[in-house]
Amino acid sequence: MWVEKGFYMSDQIYVALLDEGINVWRPVPALRLESNTYVVLRPDDYDPSVETWQFPPGTLVVCEQKQLADGIFPVAIRQTEDVRRTA
């Protein structure tokens, strides 16, 4: 799924919301750097006082395809520091 953001196209990934009491996944825009490595982007409605993201905007993450309620989607599973170590 593609989301237009500024002058480039970004992918949509899912990030876990913390402190919700149940598993909640937030769709967020992300810039793909490699096949499974993304930088989480800041959507216009981002408000850290309302939602606590496991990986906030600016975080470099590794994603895996996971089954969620509505299908299989790329889900951020861990933070990484180096794009070369994520393959």
Predicted segments with their positions:
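Mixed-charge, low-complexity intrinsically disordered regions
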Residues: 2-87
